[in-house]
């Protein structure tokens, strides 16, 4: 078991290093010189050279990669070209927006999808089933950013109940910050909830046909108790798997929603860094996303190991 | 745009009842608040600045937050584009134009307590013109040969050659005065002498400024206590933030097609002013067939500027015949030099040896005005048998690399933001690859005199040369689309220099 774990962790580190090399190579191939962008249309060769030197862009690629990697390993992610502040702090600031947003969206989608999916499965073709089908088809078909625009029009522009966008920061109180995350979380949650409703519905349907469910019915338990007490908890495993996958997707994929609501999240940081060729920030953010996916996969692997003894035996060979 | 129907009457009634109770409860507080005029401002901008030091990076957004609010210069440029004294209260220019003697104000302090004097001014200018300088307008200072500071109040600039635009340039955001102790950190924590102090920067969202209680200029009455610059890049989100009341003002609204959506809003007012943003379609003047003046003239005559403005910017914009705006001193309306005439254009093209036209590629940045203009131009060029392919080119990164630095392009389109930058056609190297000794001579002559009337005459001649020679197709000047609260006073309606000067902004009771 320990050997296996060590091997897995070693593999994880190798993967991260490989990813970092790939990310660095891709950045090096991107057209556009950050120094030239900073100086704009009045750049002269002389000022350009001075700025490139200041930014460290005049160093050979291999040295720049080495410096970046060595820095990243010691927790120093470098300084943003455009903002002039350490990238680690920037990412932390953005996570303080993106993580609560993703968590809120997940929470909302679970609260809607699990009861709706289960109720739909309980009575196929019934009212909730039709509702669930309609909801999930709409949720998948309608783009989240468009929903976001509609929400802004209704709740911010017309009714004035909610801010139209922006983020006051957690320093100005929890409520104002939370308030500015509600509409984007709804917009973000809708497509997720749609997928999750479908997954829940089919998982519950499958579980309903399992032996223990039939046994429970045969024992004379009421339909509701069988469904909510036995079937739904057992059907949650595939639902949780999808949720895990969605979380990484939400953290990385909220760019459009963050743009509609002008939220200073991680997705928008990556987008801005790309257009400004703030290469250091972009490298770090991409590496962070990659690391997130790799670590989540690692945790999933570990949980399989914990569940299935056969894998443990196989791994120790 | 989608409209929502009103809530049902019962909902409205319930809401009204609720708010009646609430407002009665808050009446006392409300009354005491109403007596004091509002002293905060939420101002929107489309682009977030990259750093907050205008002396080390070019993006105009930096100056739009900091210039005149945090940082001040020896001189300033006012609402009408005039040079006015600021940290220098007066100056004298020697008869040969080679020595500028400034008398500086005394008792001026930076926000962190550093004193401003001639040594500080010398430090700032040496930093801007030195070998390590990354000042985006370093060329402004290139003729300063040496700087003398006989006493704390006196600054003397000795020039290697007369520089008639020096005073104007010293009024720019890139020429503001910085403190020796604080300049290294100005990018993230700017320290200036202005009426507002930097307070906080939530990257990706907003910058906060607060009133400087120790501001040196007692003749102005700064009313705002706190200003928040919020950065919103999406036009729909900009409009929503204005209508929802999240923002008090958007001095440079980015979407002309949404301007009329503010009509009928009782709280907001719209103002259409001038900017210095010249939208021009630059051509590679050394590449065939653009090396032939007749071809360039034919292309200019194939374009109906009015239609382009209509298509690209909802009709809001001023047609130009040269690289000059109606704001600028000595402006001449030259749109009649090569007016829209497709038949003449076709004949000229045949004369140049292209009776059947030709085809080329335009590299267009993604900013809304560029692809929209290009599409209208494409149709107009087709009328004279010229095929124009549109190649989207990411701005700034790819555009700077391909067009600006690489000069690997046929035609491009971009809005030039620098005020009074007609001299770019004399710069070598510059992306147009335009070379005209007569024009260069004029640009030199302008620097040899500090006499405004003489300069204006020379600028007039320079405009005429460009209008005739068309190194770039001169299309239009962008309007300054201001949207703000009706009770807000003192924001600039025109923009002789990119800025959001808040010194005289206040709320009407």
Predicted regions and their residues:
Chain B
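Detector for C-terminal structural segments
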Residues: 23, 39-42, 202, 206, ...
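Alpha-helical secondary-structure segments
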Residues: 42, 117-124, 152-158, 194-195, ...
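N-terminal lobe/hinge region of extracytoplasmic solute-binding protein
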Residues: 44-95, 126, 191-192
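A structural "hinge/loop" feature
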Residues: 47-64, 87-88, 114, 136-137, ...
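Gly/Pro-rich hinge or "lid" segments in bacterial periplasmic/extracellular proteins
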Residues: 82, 163, 168-222, 226-228, ...
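Aromatic- and charge-enriched surface segment that lines or borders ligand/interaction sites
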Residues: 89-134, 150, 156, 289
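Surface-exposed binding/hinge segments that line
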Residues: 103, 137-179, 200-202
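Ligand-site clamp/hinge motif
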Residues: 184, 214-260, 378, 387
């Amino acid at each position: 078991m320990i050997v296996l774990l060590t091997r897995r962790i070693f593999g994880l580190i190798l993967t991260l290093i490989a990813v970092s090399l790939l990310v660095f190579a891709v950045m090096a191939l991107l057209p556009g010189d950050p120094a030239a962008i900073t100086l704009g249309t009045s750049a002269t060769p002389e000022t350009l050279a001075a700025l490139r030197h200041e930014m460290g862009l005049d160093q050979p690629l291999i040295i720049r990669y080495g410096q970046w990697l060595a820095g990243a390993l010691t927790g120093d992610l470098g300084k943003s070209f455009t903002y002039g502040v350490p990238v680690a702090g920037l990412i932390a600031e953005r996570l303080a927006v993106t993580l609560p947003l993703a968590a809120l969206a997940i929470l909302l989608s679970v609260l809607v999808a699990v009861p709706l999916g289960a109720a739909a499965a309980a009575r196929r073709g019934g009212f909730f089933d039709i509702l669930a089908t309609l909801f999930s088809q709409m949720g998948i078909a309608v783009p989240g950013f468009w929903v976001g625009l509609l929400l802004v029009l209704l709740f911010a522009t017309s009714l004035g109940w909610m801010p139209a966008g922006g983020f006051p920061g957690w320093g100005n109180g929890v409520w104002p910050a939370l308030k500015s995350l509600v509409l984007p979380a709804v917009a973000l949650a809708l497509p997720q909830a749609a997928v999750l409703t479908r997954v829940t519905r089919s998982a519950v349907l499958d579980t309903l046909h399992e032996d223990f469910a039939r046994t429970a019915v045969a024992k004379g338990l009421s339909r509701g108790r069988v469904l909510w007490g036995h079937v739904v908890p057992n059907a949650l495993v595939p639902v949780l798997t999808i949720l895990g996958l969605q979380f990484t997707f939400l953290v990385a994929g909220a760019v459009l929603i963050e743009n509609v609501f002008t939220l200073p999240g991680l997705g928008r940081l990556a987008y801005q860094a790309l257009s400004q060729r703030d290469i250091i920030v972009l490298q770090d953010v991409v590496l962070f996303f990659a690391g997130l996916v790799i670590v989540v996969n690692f945790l999933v692997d570990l949980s399989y190991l914990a569940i299935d003894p056969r894998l443990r035996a196989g791994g120790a060979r | 745009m989608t409209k929502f129907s009103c809530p049902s009457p019962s909902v409205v009634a319930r809401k009204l009842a609720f708010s009646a109770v609430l407002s009665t409860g808050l009446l006392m507080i409300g009354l005491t608040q109403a007596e004091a005029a509002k002293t905060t401002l939420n101002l929107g901008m489309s682009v977030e600045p990259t750093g907050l030091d205008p002396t080390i990076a070019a993006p105009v957004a930096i100056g739009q937050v900091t210039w005149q609010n945090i940082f001040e210069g020896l001189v300033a440029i006012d609402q009408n584009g005039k040079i006015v004294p600021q940290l220098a209260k007066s100056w004298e220019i020697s008869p040969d134009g080679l020595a500028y003697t400034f008398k500086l104000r005394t008792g001026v302090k930076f926000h962190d307590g550093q004193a401003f004097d001639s040594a500080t001014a010398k430090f700032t200018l040496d930093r801007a013109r030195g070998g390590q300088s990354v000042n985006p307008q370093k060329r402004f200072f290139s003729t300063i040969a040496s700087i003398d500071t006989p006493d704390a109040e006196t600054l003397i600039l000795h020039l290697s050659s007369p520089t008639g635009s020096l005073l104007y340039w010293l009024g720019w955001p890139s020429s503001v005065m910085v403190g020796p102790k604080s300049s290294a950190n100005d990018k993230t924590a700017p320290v200036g002498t202005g009426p507002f102090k930097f307070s906080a920067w939530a990257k990706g969202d907003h910058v906060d400024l607060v009133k400087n209680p120790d501001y040196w200029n007692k003749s102005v009455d700064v009313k705002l206590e706190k200003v928040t610059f919020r950065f919103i890049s999406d036009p729909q989100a900009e409009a929503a933030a204005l209508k929802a009341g999240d923002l008090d003002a958007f001095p440079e609204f980015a979407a002309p097609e949404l301007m009329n959506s503010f009509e009928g809003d009782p709280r907001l007012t719209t103002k259409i002013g001038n900017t210095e943003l010249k939208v021009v379609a630059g051509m590679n003047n050394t590449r065939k067939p653009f090396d032939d003046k007749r071809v360039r003239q034919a292309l200019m005559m194939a374009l109906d500027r009015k239609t382009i403005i209509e298509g690209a910017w909802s009709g809001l914009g001023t047609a130009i015949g040269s690289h000059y705006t109606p704001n600028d001193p000595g402006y001449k309306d030259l749109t009649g030099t090569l007016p829209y005439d497709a038949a003449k254009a076709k004949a000229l093209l045949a004369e140049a040896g292209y009776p059947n036209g030709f085809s080329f590629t335009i590299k267009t940045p993604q900013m809304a005005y560029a692809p929209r203009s290009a599409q209208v131009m494409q149709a107009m060029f087709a009328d004279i048998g010229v095929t124009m392919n549109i190649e989207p080119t990411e701005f700034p990164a790819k555009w700077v690399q391909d067009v600006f630095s690489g000069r690997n392009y046929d035609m491009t389109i971009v809005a030039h933001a620098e005020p009074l930058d007609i001299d770019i056609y004399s710069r070598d190297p510059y992306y147009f690859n335009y070379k005209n000794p007569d024009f260069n001579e004029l640009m030199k002559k302008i620097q040899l005199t500090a006499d405004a009337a003489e300069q204006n005459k020379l600028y007039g001649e320079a405009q005429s040369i460009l209008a005739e020679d068309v190194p770039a197709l001169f299309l239009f000047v962008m309007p300054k689309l201001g949207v703000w609260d009706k009770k807000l006073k003192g924001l600039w309606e025109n923009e002789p220099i990119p800025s959001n000067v808040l010194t005289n902004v206040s709320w009407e009771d």
